[in-house]
Amino acid sequence: MVSDIKEYYQCILDNLTGGLISVDLSGRVVYMNPMAGKILHMDEDHKCLGCDYNKAYAGFPALLGVVKEALETGKSVRRAEISVMHANVPLVIGYSTMRVKNHDGKELGVTVIFQDISFVASGKK
């Protein structure tokens, strides 16, 4: 049996093959996994944990819109796409959003899970 369940959960999030970012209801970045940083080309120093998501993801207007809509509407999105630019290269990002609630049903924030699907979207394999 796992001795430290919190560490185990953290390892699961850190080892996801897709990107995951989570923002609390006040708009503060709570978590960004390593793959999210890799997809968005943001290193450890630029994760902005605790920062307002508008500052953290200012270079990605479409991603800002996804987070804003999730926070404002509370609606979950399944399997949608956005385009983001990185170093003048467009990336097609497939994403889903979900509300984060505690065991009592209290809403805590939103999470966006995503992948770079540029090669799939362009028809390349």
Residue ranges: model-predicted function:
Residues 7-8, 39, 46-89:
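Terminal output helix/cap of sensory domains in signal transduction proteins
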Residues 1-40:
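Sensory modules in modular signal-transduction proteins
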